Amino acid sequence: MQPIYDWFREFYERTGINLTFIYDDFDRARVIKGFFLTLELSVVTIILSILVGIAGAWLQGSKLIWIRRIVAGFISFFRNTPPLVQIYFFYFGLGYLLPRLSDGAGGTVPMVSNLQWAIISLSLFAGAFNIEIFRSGIEAIPKSTMEAGTSLGLSRWQNYRFVILPMAIRVCLPALGNNLVNLVKTTNLAYAIAVPELLYVAKQIWGDSTNVREMMFFVLFAYLFLVFVLVAILHWIERRLAIPGFGQDAGKQMPQLSDVMVPVPSMPAAGGPAIARMLLLFVIMIGFGATVALAQTGTPKASAAEVLIRWMPLLLWGFAFNILISIAAMAVGTVAGVPVGIGQLSQWKVLRIGTRVATQLFRNSPWLVLLFLCVFLIPFEFRIFGLRIPFPDWAKAILGFSLPVMANTSELVRGAIRSIATGQWDGAQALGLSRWQTLRLVILPQSVKRMLPPWMNLYSLIAMSTVNASIVGVTEMITLTGQVHAAEGSRPELLAPLYAFALLCFFVYCYPIGKWTQALERRFQVKA
């Protein structure tokens, strides 16, 4: 292997392309360790999230209403708040409340490590989506199947374990696979709490070797490789476990919208009192964290409520900036994604392949990695005819978030157009309309209604993802939360209330979007 390492070292000297993670022993060891930690994080969170989904779906069928409400609250909380803030809340907030353990050398270590907190948080986040996925699979099982299990003397748990769950898994495998792929792409958020996964290691290497471009593209293609392998495995499992009459076999006669649309997860169904219960839960979280913290410190410092009231205008200003970033990213991404989606259906092979590749590339890339690419590779200013035009970090963040929006919007457009009955095209052709006229005057107006609900879901996900901009230094709500914490003397007892307030803001904003989306889905539902 040494000749290969020497060749890459000489390649760097000739071209300036510094692939230090290949020819340098120390960097290569760090990359390998980071990659396998990313792989471990992905595998463990996938397994735990599936277990959470299975347990939650079973509890949703409980006869006890308070259990069903707890599960509904759990789903609403984790699906309507940013996963990054959840990680911060668990690691910084709850982590401070737990006792520390002796390390045997006179020091102490946290009871739960940063890696363990990342696993817990990401597993619960993905598990909330899996609960709804398994529930939809269970609802697709004929009632006669459940009644047959009961008639054989099986208990409710036995019926669920041996009859319903195996069939439900086979029915919901496509949706489950999509969520697991999204989970793998989300694992890089562990970077924010210094888990030495692939992105964290890559940043250390480019800090030592100033090879930002090379390391960022390596991380991007490494995650694409993981996604490709996972998708291949899931497709193999799906083919092996396919049930005749469900999934693709059932939709061969006419393509259904759910078969061709991009898998943007929808928000959970919940009753009107759900939001009141969640608001009460957030108040309890803030109050509990503040009470325990004051009991531990025993000092008459400003309470968490006083700190929140004092700094609330600043924090809300930061939250408003998050919303502005999300709106701008959706606008830019949608404007770019519509023509790309139409291009995927073009009769020109080169255009069709090019737009398809671009869509899949940005759709399957981790959003945080795309954000890093835009922030670190785009210059901070441009010179045009001697005029310096600044390009601030917040503008780079908008561009970074607009790339996945473009890709997902492209898939929404392609899927919506394909779901229109072919008779619409034939009728327009009979009237003498050209292909472009048919698309503009007949197909796209019908497609808009079908695209709107998943497009709203996509916006909700983008709004929650804007907190990732805090990692690259954009001054938004989470960045200001850290500054408020520092201004209050970096008191660790304030972390749980501050991050709980951030979760509350996003929940209050995203939950109504989910309810509106459900209303749009019912209104624009495609009839079979």
Give the positions of each predicted feature:
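Transmembrane alpha-helices and adjacent helix-loop boundaries
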Residues: 1-528
